[in-house]
């Protein structure tokens, strides 16, 4: 069992139930899924760039990503309908908790000039999104083998009813928010 899943079931649930004054244990917020998204606009010019991005995302997530295609042609961006422009991965279950563990303990502390996560990135329903400017923060990515530095978006979807519950859940997991 993943370390954070065990920690959630044994400690976080009881702590949040009393902290949020919830009656039922099923009301305690939980993380449903984590979505990783990497936009690769340069892939329209060179197909190799997309391959490198897919390899990076596969190494980070431990799961094969899905290539996202453009929905319509945009002349200003020089892309056509149906061209590959990004990749995404949705993590659930054990892999989600393993990724969350690596994100909190290894990747976030390795971010340059890090002063804490913004508490304003909640969407109003308890879900949290953050962007990373460099994929090299993850230990799976070898700096010598990458072609360029790419960022990625991380969306954490929770069962929380509002931002306060979502913030309490992520703080219980050890997310370093700005105070």
Curated annotation (Swiss-Prot):
Keywords: Ribonucleoprotein, Ribosomal protein, RNA-binding, rRNA-binding, tRNA-binding. One of its GO terms (molecular function) is structural constituent of ribosome. It holds the Pfam family Ribosomal_L5_C. GO terms for biological process: translation. It comes from the Bacteria. One of its GO terms (cellular component) is ribosome. InterPro entries: Ribosomal_uL5, Ribosomal_uL5_bac-type, Ribosomal_uL5_C, Ribosomal_uL5_CS, Ribosomal_uL5_dom_sf, Ribosomal_uL5_N. This is one of the proteins that bind and probably mediate the attachment of the 5S RNA into the large ribosomal subunit, where it forms part of the central protuberance. In the 70S ribosome it contacts protein S13 of the 30S subunit (bridge B1b), connecting the 2 subunits; this bridge is implicated in subunit movement. Contacts the P site tRNA; the 5S rRNA and some of its associated proteins might help stabilize positioning of ribosome-bound tRNAs. Part of the 50S ribosomal subunit; part of the 5S rRNA/L5/L18/L25 subcomplex. Contacts the 5S rRNA and the P site tRNA. Forms a bridge to the 30S subunit in the 70S ribosome. Belongs to the universal ribosomal protein uL5 family. HAMAP family: Ribosomal_uL5_B. This is Large ribosomal subunit protein uL5. The lineage of its organism: Bacteria, Pseudomonadati, Pseudomonadota, Gammaproteobacteria, Thiotrichales. The gene is rplE.
């Amino acid at each position: 069992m993943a370390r954070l899943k065990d920690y959630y079931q044994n400690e976080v649930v009881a702590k949040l139930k009393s902290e949020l004054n919830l009656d039922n244990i099923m009301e305690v917020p939980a993380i449903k899924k984590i979505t990783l998204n990497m936009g690769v606009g340069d892939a329209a010019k060179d197909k190799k760039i997309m391959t490198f991005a897919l390899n990076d995302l596969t190494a980070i997530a431990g799961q094969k990503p899905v290539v996202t295609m453009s929905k319509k042609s945009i002349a200003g961006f020089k892309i056509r309908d149906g061209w590959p422009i990004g990749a995404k991965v949705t993590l659930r279950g054990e892999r989600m908790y393993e990724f969350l563990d690596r994100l909190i303990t290894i990747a976030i502390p390795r971010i340059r000039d890090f002063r804490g996560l913004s508490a304003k990135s909640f969407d109003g329903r308890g879900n949290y999104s953050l962007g990373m400017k460099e994929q090299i923060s993850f230990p799976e990515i070898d700096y010598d083998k990458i072609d360029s530095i790419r960022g990625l978006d991380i969306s954490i979807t929770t069962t929380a009813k509002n931002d306060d519950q979502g913030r309490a859940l992520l703080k219980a997991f050890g997310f370093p928010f700005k105070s």
